[in-house]
Amino acid sequence: MLILSRKVNEGIVIDDNIHIKVISIDRGSVRLGFEAPESTLILRTELKEAIVSENQKASASVDESLLENIKKVIKP
């Protein structure tokens, strides 16, 4: 992991097309601004983790009887 120190109004550039700028620092909270192509997905970590968790729950809740019926229909 690369760790950088930046002050307000300073920034970093990733791959020449993603710009991240420190907008403000206030009582333990940092506001960041992002400039990136529209095709670049930018998510907060907690949102990404929630999506992964929901996807895992959805895939784990497969009805076993449904799978057995599918196996009966599709025979090798």
UniProtKB/Swiss-Prot annotation:
Keywords recorded for this protein, A-Z: Bacterial flagellum biogenesis, Cytoplasm, Repressor, RNA-binding, Translation regulation
Cellular compartment(s): Cytoplasm
GO cellular component: cytosol
InterPro entries, alphabetized: CsrA, CsrA_sf
Alphabetized GO MF terms: mRNA 5'-UTR binding
Listed Pfam families: CsrA
Any GO BP: mRNA catabolic process
Gene3D superfamilies cross-referenced by the UniProt entry: Translational regulator CsrA (2.60.40.4380)
UniProt keyword Cytoplasm, yes or no: yes
Role description: A translational regulator that binds mRNA to regulate translation initiation and/or mRNA stability. Usually binds in the 5'-UTR at or near the Shine-Dalgarno sequence preventing ribosome-binding, thus repressing translation. Its main target seems to be the major flagellin gene, while its function is anatagonized by FliW.
Subunit structure, interactors included: Homodimer; the beta-strands of each monomer intercalate to form a hydrophobic core, while the alpha-helices form wings that extend away from the core.
Family indicated by similarity: Belongs to the CsrA/RsmA family.
Descriptive protein name: Translational regulator CsrA
Lineage: Bacteria, Pseudomonadati, Campylobacterota, Epsilonproteobacteria, Campylobacterales
Name of the coding gene: csrA
